[in-house]
Amino acid sequence: MKIKEIEISKLKELKEKSMMLKDERQKGKVIYKIWDIVVVVILAVLADCNEWEEIADYARDEKDFLKKFLKLTGGIPTAKTYERVISLIDSQELNKIFVDFIKDIQFMDDIYFKDILSFDGKVDKGSSRKKGYIVEETKHLNVLNVYSDKLQMCIDQEMIEEKTNEITAIPDVIKRLDLTNVICTWDALNTQKDNVKAVISKGGDYCVALKANQGNFYKDVQDYFDEDRLLIIESGYEGAYQLTREKNHEAVITYEYYQTEKVNWYPDIKLWEGLKSIGLVKRTIDQSDGTRVEEKRYYISSLLLDISVFSNAIRKHWNVENKLHWQMDFTFKSDDNTTMNKKALFNLQIIKKFCLTILNEVKKEKNKSLKRIRKDISRNVEKETIEIFKLLRNFDTSIISKSR
């Protein structure tokens, strides 16, 4: 099958971006080009390969196709070579070429719309080993991910030792990010003074959960939103209120959002940089059997009074779980990967997250599940791979026409 240059222009662009990666291997001993390695791993992951052995098998099986746009000097590497070379790549550089590629194919139709960056940790359970007679204990790979609602992709990540290390990792990650016109969200574990200060220092906003780990502050906010206060807000005499309702065959779920700018009553307000509002979300579940369950979550924020922006930030926070972490487990079988080289696994996960974004773009046209799209590619690699990159090129072309 002859490939037209225009059909794989986005694929060649991806290769060109990969050629920008620094190669830390010893010169004179390099057999395989680093960009060949990266592009093959990307295409293999798109084609339903999750493990290093599967990636090497893909390269051998599809060698004739790959040679149409890659050099493949030195032949086809082994699974161990793929793992080793990927482990040597600078993770930030790798992530940057992927974010730049996605930005090229996505049209931001409202530059004034605030992006929501959700920070959350994920554990890859297959990457650990218990201590044995001849085996040292190896801990799980823990990663702090930053998910962009606007780009619908993970735009940054940091390897951490334990889940609790998210707290200290967040300021370091924030230093790398442009937070202009951005709202940062995270769960209550990470609601710390240093973290909100880091957001404000980079020009961003925050809307973050508050729980008992903040002691008196949590109790004070909880006491403020008593039943009388909620009635005042609902009646429009203070703050803002919004109600939404969802129905399914088992229950009716009601969400009530309360936000107020009255925060000067709190004596330590200056300790929380940029604090301008506090809020509450009350979720009520009315089940079909007549039982009712109610829960309340409390929030602090640098946002001015705007219940639509406030409620949207809270809802969109869960995208990091639903659209990223769940897909990494369900579609890419992350917990099944037993790679012990943490850097190799970390970089492979960066590649998988990039592939997830590509597949989500393709899904808009294919109208199939991500798993089915990957299966389709694996059954007819050349045809389906070309089709995917043609679609990405078409998205790119439509962006150019819209921007004129």
Where do the protein language model's features map onto the residues?
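A short, flexible helix-boundary coil/loop motif
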Residues: 3, 17, 21, 60-62, ...
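Basic, short loop/linker segments at the boundary and entry of helix-turn-helix/winged-helix-like folds
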Residues: 8-39
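Short, positively charged, Gly/Tyr-enriched micro-motifs
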Residues: 29-97, 189-192, 199, 355
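Mobile genetic element proteins and their domesticated derivatives, centered on retroelements
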Residues: 40, 55, 78, 120, ...
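Active-site- or DNA-interface-adjacent structural scaffold in DNA-acting proteins
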Residues: 72-132
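Polybasic low-complexity intrinsically disordered regions
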Residues: 105-204
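An anionic, glycine-rich sequence signature occurring as long contiguous blocks
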Residues: 211-315
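A C-terminal functional module that forms or caps the active site or interfaces directly
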Residues: 279-359
